[in-house]
Amino acid sequence: MKTKRLTVAQATIEYLKNQYVERDGVQNKFFAGCLGILGHGNVAGIGQALHQNLDFPFYVARNEQGMVHTAAAFARVKNRLQTFVCTSSIGPGATNMITGAAAATINRIPVLLIPGDIFATRQVAPVLQQ
């Protein structure tokens, strides 16, 4: 077996691509792709890994709350056998996903939210939302 070096983000995308659910003996890919708004906090990690994995579709969203509602609606249509990963930038982008997450939780709809983050040791200039 050959070792394959991956970043954490690349390994995460590989892991998500290989998740399956089984019902009545039929296996389905669990994640149909990723919906997201790339910004500070997720471009360098998840954004780059998604760009390198063209077989895991990425769809640009325009609103974080709508993105989560879209993923939940897709999961409902697919009878909870398939859903989307949702990613956003840090700060308000991440908090805008909370309403959609609450609605999905109440309705027992699977969605995976991956908000952006920054390195704890990173020394950056004082920029809004960091």
Model-derived features with residue positions:
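N-terminal alpha/beta PP-like core and its mobile active-site loop of ThDP/TPP-dependent enzymes
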Residues: 2-130
